[in-house]
Amino acid sequence: MVSSTSQIISTSPSRDDVVPSRKKVTLPPWLEVAKPRLIPLLLATTLGGMALSEGWPLPSPRLACTLGGGALAAAAAGALNCLWEQDLDGRMKRTSSRALPAGKLSPSAVFTGAISCTLAAAALLVSGVNCLAAGLSLLGLCSYVLLYTAFLKPRTSQNIVIGGVAGAIPPLVGAAAATGHIGLSGWWLFALVMVWTPAHFWALAILLKDDYRSVGIPMLPVVKGSVFTAKAIAQYGWATVLLSCFGVFALPEGGALYGILLVPFNVRLLQMVRRLAADPEDLQRAKGLFRWSILYMFGICLLLVVSRSTLADQFHNQAIYLFTNMGSVFSIA
């Protein structure tokens, strides 16, 4: 089994090619520990939570404070994650050159920066948005660092299923920023991100399973293998597609346009999931699914925003008119 796996890996693309941008772009150490590549998607889902609310569009100052505070909280979470896992990162080839294991930054400097970002995020959100948004952002930070990184990740192969709550909180922050409370629509996007996360992350874990195995992290592909993981990805992929359709009802307006534009996103996601299920050991297929899953969630959030535009309102009204007057439209005089 070991020899066959080695043969597959030797004829597959190098693991260094999983996320090429990490090799091509060298970030300053203080920026690297903030994990800036993760922040745009978190902010996109925050915008999605806003777009689902009756308070959309937000006043520009409140919008800026929400996104700025969210970015600071995410940066703090990334830095604390790097701080917690510095020994682990130092033992993996892929991460050994990161700022902390390589000695480019001191742990005390990273901790000070993380606390400063946390305080700045809280101050910005409390003063410029509301206490609920601030509290939710801090909850997301704590759940990522304490629940996922410190507790779940080293203990269970279902770590990302439960720990995915951290990445699903930004839509709630967006909803809270827009209206001061969390409605059913905000909880729908929270649930969508939760069920999307395992398929997204396990595709990456298939690519990096040897790294995780080398340091004893029980990611699902390490514990159950790529074939089992691909089946689990398919299940969560279908759940994501089905749950995404409820956005038609979650949107206050523009649901019809959202539903139409959603179709190609879901079709492509299912195609990528099916390709991986057909050959779970193909690293290119796993990489393709991982990348598309990111674009998929960006696309969902973009559709939510577009569906709340004036053009979407006009489309929605025309669709309702045609539906309610279908008899007269197609009647023959």
Swiss-Prot record:
GO terms for biological process: heme O biosynthetic process. Keywords: Cell inner membrane, Cell membrane, Heme biosynthesis, Membrane, Transferase, Transmembrane, Transmembrane helix. CDD domains: PT_UbiA_Cox10. It is a multi-pass membrane protein. Residues 1-21 are annotated as: Disordered. One of its GO terms (molecular function) is protoheme IX farnesyltransferase activity. It is found in: Cell inner membrane. Its EC number is 2.5.1.141. The chain crosses the membrane at residues 38-58, 63-83, 109-129, 132-152, 160-180, 188-208, 245-265, 286-306. Residues 1-13 have a biased composition (Low complexity). Pfam families: UbiA. The keyword Transmembrane applies. InterPro entries: Protohaem_IX_farnesylTrfase, UbiA_prenyltransferase, UbiA_prenylTrfase_CS, UbiA_sf. It catalyses: heme b + (2E,6E)-farnesyl diphosphate + H2O = Fe(II)-heme o + diphosphate. Carbon 2 of the heme B porphyrin ring is defined according to the Fischer nomenclature. Belongs to the UbiA prenyltransferase family. Protoheme IX farnesyltransferase subfamily. NCBIfam families: cyoE_ctaB, PRK04375.1-2. This is Protoheme IX farnesyltransferase. It comes from Prochlorococcus marinus (strain SARG / CCMP1375 / SS120).
